[in-house]
Amino acid sequence: MKTLSTEEIAKSYGGRQVVKGVNLQIEQGEVVGLLGPNGAGKTTSFYMIVGLVRPDSGRVLASGHDISNLPMYLRARSYGISYLPQEPSVFRKLTVQDNILAVLEAQQLSWEARRTRTERLIEQLNLGHVRKTRGYALSGGERRRVEIARCLAIEPAFILLDEPFSGIDPIAVLDLQEIIFGLKRSGIGVLITDHNVRETLSVTDRAYIITEGKIFATGTPGELGRNPDVRRIYLGENFSMD
């Protein structure tokens, strides 16, 4: 079982420590949330796991291997860590099919293997009806599915999702949640950071709550929802998953 974890990662900006020794772990086949108030350090922690930010101290580990100093492309190539940014990442002037093929050009695959994998991803993400549609003409939900298909093109062990529920309508949210459940069933580990708390907790097996740069609490969605301290500092007293 592959794992993605951190050991005491820390980060300071301008003399202010924003992450203070964060420890977390994700295994293949589980969905984990990384949540917390604005300014709590969750985004910086997430970016250190992704490879966008280098920790000042501590380590990011892929199945025990220190990847703290590896760039994103080597984390993807060597350890199967894929990243979906919050910002739109599709090529606007390419069709859905060509968007997926473009990612596969970097893989050591024959043309036929690339075409076969593209067809499988189009079917898996229910994109057949828009395969010839260019990126700029996609809806928010369709664009998200194309972006996830591109993440899956490298056959990752882990997918890191940055604000995946941002900017899409309620129907697309439900669609995306089903896709995340499908990723879990296929044995992919998923780490989500998002401001949409209910949508995120609805798909997670467990979550970490960060505040003031430290892990404040961890548990299942039910455990966190019943935790009076978590409700006080983050969820609010009237929080409900209903």
Model region roles, listed by residue range:
Residues 112-130, 178-181:
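Conserved ABC ATPase "signature" region
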Residues 155:
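Conserved catalytic motifs of ABC-family nucleotide-binding domains
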Residues 35-37:
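The feature captures the beta-strand-to-loop junction immediately N-terminal to the Walker
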